[in-house]
Regions:
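Catalytic alpha-helical scaffold of carbohydrate-active enzymes acting on polysaccharides/glycoconjugates
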Residues: 2-208, 213-251, 270-291, 298-333
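Short strand-loop junctions, especially beta-strand C-caps/beta-turns
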Residues: 256, 294-296
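C-terminal amphipathic alpha-helical segment
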Residues: 255-277
Length: 333
């Protein structure tokens, strides 16, 4: 209730004052908020990092005016910088990957891309508006060389061949809304099945799932499909803490905060300071901090706080203060 009122007040302000309000609240409260669980007794803090690896797929029905080709190109460029730094520092992360990226190519049949796949019904949510055409209209039905924003087997190979043991998780096949409001059983089952099928040729059997747009739902379908852990928090105020076991047996790990910021006006030095606070408190409480991000973040953000926060994670681990784990590795805690 308090958070809802806060969000209503914040959204009514000009953007400059929204940012100042966020800074003020962070300063006067005990943020980042920690929720304890006596079932866990960790020896040190843990940092988990998950990447929503999507290229053009996440943005095609965005309500914002976005050049999806530009975003996909930036993500490809950033990918090499990010993976090189992760491997240099030996920081494993979870790459939550859209299933279509595993394809070398695809083609139209019966006049449609992926004609045998179930489609979402028209819908509108907080982020996307899909009101006309076919869900796969944007699919170029080419290949990773002609249309690198829609296919990425070359990048998948780089992840798999890294000296650091990264995890590849499922992020659906086509980045659709998994909420009960905007999906249906056959659609969800098809999205999960097709994503697994696209991963098969790489020998990947994912156990972790990240919801597209962080739009939660279809938990029983995920359990039935063999997933073991999801990025999800039932307690919206929890920023640091421990995994939860849902009623159907799925493990859920909260996300703490996103490492990419879309509001203009933030000072990147402030953001670096803020992200360090999350790590420091996770160390102090011997809890889990779970960062997530889009690899398409702006290059200035990448340089000024994203890569520096990776360096900070590395230094704190080298000092024996924390561990770095993937989502999959949390299952055995």
């Amino acid at each position: 209730m308090i958070k809802k009122i806060y969000n209503q007040i914040r959204s009514s302000l000009p953007q400059k004052y929204q940012i100042e309000l966020s800074k003020f609240v962070f300063r006067i409260t005990d943020k980042p908020f920690f929720v304890n669980d006596e079932n866990y007794d960790l020896k040190k803090g843990i940092v988990v990092v998950s990447a929503d690896f999507e290229l053009a797929w996440a943005w095609r029905y965005s309500k914002k005016k976005i050049n999806i080709s530009e975003i996909a190109e930036r993500e490809r460029n950033n990918f090499h910088i990010i993976i090189n730094r992760l491997n240099e520092l030996d920081i494993p992360i979870t790459w939550a990957t859209v299933g279509h990226l595993f394809l070398d190519s695809c083609k139209r049949e019966n006049g449609k891309a992926h004609w045998d796949m179930y489609r979402p019904n028209y819908f509108e949510n907080e982020y996307w508006k899909y009101k006309y055409g076919d869900w796969f209209d944007i699919d170029p039905c080419g290949n990773y060389k002609s249309d690198p924003g829609f296919y990425a087997p070359d990048l998948i190979e780089i992840i798999l061949n890294s000296k650091t043991n990264h995890e590849i998780a499922c992020h659906s096949f086509s980045h659709c809304d998994f909420s009960e409001r905007n999906s249906y059983s056959k659609l969800i089952d098809a999205e999960l099945s097709e994503c697994r099928k696209s991963m098969d040729k790489f020998g990947i059997r994912p156990v972790s799932f990240v919801f597209p747009g962080n739009l939660y739902g279809s938990f029983d379908h995920l359990k039935k499909a063999g997933f073991k852990i999801i990025r999800y928090k039932a307690n919206d105020s929890k920023e640091l803490g421990y995994p939860e076991i849902l009623k159907n047996g799925l493990m859920a790990i909260h996300d703490s905060i996103a490492l990419d910021v879309y509001e203009d006006g933030w000072d990147n030095n402030y953001l670096l300071w803020k992200y360090k606070k999350y790590i420091d408190k996770a160390i102090d409480k011997k809890a889990i901090c779970h960062f997530w991000f889009h690899p398409s973040l702006q290059y200035k953000q990448l340089e000024e706080y994203f890569l520096p926060i990776l360096n900070y994670i590395h230094s704190q681990r080298e000092n024996g203060k924390l561990e770095v784990l993937t989502m999959e590795q949390l299952i055995t805690l």
